Curated annotation (Swiss-Prot):
Record flagged with keyword Nucleotidyltransferase: no
GO CC terms: mitochondrial inner membrane; mitochondrion
Similarity section: Belongs to the MTFP1 family.
Name the record gives this protein: Mitochondrial fission process protein 1
Length: 162
């Protein structure tokens, strides 16, 4: 995209700005990283926050689409539904399920490795796992986003012609 084209494209606050990193989009990954140190209800709440982010982005995208001109009300309703569903799917996989699973398994196996190969005290081991889990989050973002984008282009988006 040329600089002129990119300046005409509206910035998506839910995908293209630091809002993603302010505890909303990645709330559940942070919850997963802290799993060994907090009560299960805290981890569950982190998923509530993450799904709240998914809902907010979906409503935002649907609302913006509803404000655009359409040939008729039927076409408008169809486009709004497609945009909202596409956003729910993309955000659920790219922001909640895949990253949450990735950090959960990373922390689980890191804990196992440290438990078997070191003599770290339990509390230090748990904090080390949490720190490593948190440090991993920035490295998984873009590969997961690209994977989900590609997977959706090859599957769901073909179904609803997005």
């Amino acid at each position: 995209m040329s600089p002129v084209e990119s300046s005409n494209v509206e910035k998506d606050i839910f995908r293209d700005t630091p809002v993603r990193f302010l505890g909303k989009r990645y709330a559940n990954e942070v919850g997963e990283a802290f799993r060994s140190l907090v009560k299960p209800v805290v981890v569950k709440f982190s998923y509530v926050v993450a799904f709240g982010y998914v809902a907010a982005d979906s409503v935002d995208k649907g609302f913006k689409e509803s404000k655009k001109p359409h040939a008729n009300d039927t076409e408008k309703a169809k486009r709004v539904a497609i945009i909202a569903v596409d956003t729910v799917l993309w955000q659920t996989f790219a922001s909640v399920l895949i990253p949450g699973f990735t950090i959960n398994r990373f922390c689980f196996f890191t804990n196992m490795l440290l438990e078997k190969s070191t003599k770290l005290p339990t509390n230090l081991r748990k904090w080390t796992v949490t720190a490593l889990g948190l440090a991993t989050i920035p490295f998984i973002v873009h590969p997961i986003d690209a994977f989900v984008e590609d997977a959706m282009n090859k599957t769901a988006r073909k179904v609803y012609n997005y």
